[in-house]
């Protein structure tokens, strides 16, 4: 089964991907690697997954509906595990648009990708 995991470089996404790969699923991991959390730590997590022919990482922003549409058409996932989100309550007061883009528009784009591709 091909599984799309958003938020792939985050703590939870990283562990979910490891479990999926251990159970013979193929995984496409998506993350925008934003700087809210340490990017070096995110890259280290992706490196720890290692070179696995069943894993494909793509850096992208889920708020771009055209990229998300192209992604779904290209990879044709069987399942989606959506873990991507802009975290941090205090930061939401400083930069509310980042939350709208990631947590609302990004989620809507994932839902639309699922809807249009029978996921």
Each predicted region: which residue ranges?
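N-terminal Rossmann-like NAD(P)+-binding domain of SDR-like oxidoreductases, especially those catalyzing
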Residues: 1-119
């Amino acid at each position: 089964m091909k599984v799309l995991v958003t938020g792939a470089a985050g703590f939870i996404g990283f562990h979910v991907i490891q479990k999926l790969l251990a159970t013979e699923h193929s995984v496409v991991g998506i993350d925008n690697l934003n700087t809210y959390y340490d990017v070096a730590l995110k890259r280290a997590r992706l490196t720890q997954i290692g070179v696995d022919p069943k894993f494909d990482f793509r850096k992208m922003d889920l708020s771009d509906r055209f990229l998300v549409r192209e992604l779904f058409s290209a990879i044709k996932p069987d399942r989606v595990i959506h873990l991507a989100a802009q975290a941090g309550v205090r930061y939401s007061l400083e930069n509310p648009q980042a939350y709208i883009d990631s947590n609302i528009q990004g989620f809507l784009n994932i839902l639309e990708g699922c809807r249009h591709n029978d996921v």
